[in-house]
Amino acid sequence: MGMRMMFTVFLLVALATTVASFTLDRASNGRNAAADDKPSDWIALAIKQCCANPPCKHVNCR
């Protein structure tokens, strides 16, 4: 593999790493549209509502 090809591969890897890092950082920085409706948020909300209800709390919450 020639030097030019190795340099090109290096640049592609650096670009891919930068793009992946940027998108992961953006998703974890705040509450963007994709992160607002995660299933885990809905499950946590359902558990909180259930545990506020005494009959449900007695059966399902620990």
UniProtKB/Swiss-Prot annotation:
Q: Please list the residues that carry the modification Pyrrolidone carboxylic acid.
A: 49
Q: Which GO terms describe its molecular function?
A: acetylcholine receptor inhibitor activity; ion channel regulator activity; toxin activity
Q: What is its main location?
A: secreted
- Pro-region residues? 22-48
Which keywords does UniProt give here? Acetylcholine receptor inhibiting toxin, Disulfide bond, Ion channel impairing toxin, Neurotoxin, Postsynaptic neurotoxin, Pyrrolidone carboxylic acid, Secreted, Signal, Toxin
What does the tissue specificity note say? Expressed by the venom duct.
Q: Give the range the annotation lists for the signal sequence.
A: 1-21
Q: Which family does it belong to?
A: Belongs to the conotoxin A superfamily.
Q: What is known of its domains?
A: The cysteine framework is I (CC-C-C). Alpha4/4 pattern.
Function, in words: Alpha-conotoxins bind to the nicotinic acetylcholine receptors (nAChR) and inhibit them. This synthetic peptide (10 uM) selectively, but weakly inhibits both rat neuronal alpha-3-beta-2/CHRNA3-CHRNB2 (63%) and alpha-3-beta-4/CHRNA3-CHRNB4 (37%) subtypes of nAChR.
Q: What is this protein called?
A: Alpha-conotoxin-like Qc1.2
Its ancestry begins with: Eukaryota, Metazoa, Spiralia, Lophotrochozoa, Mollusca
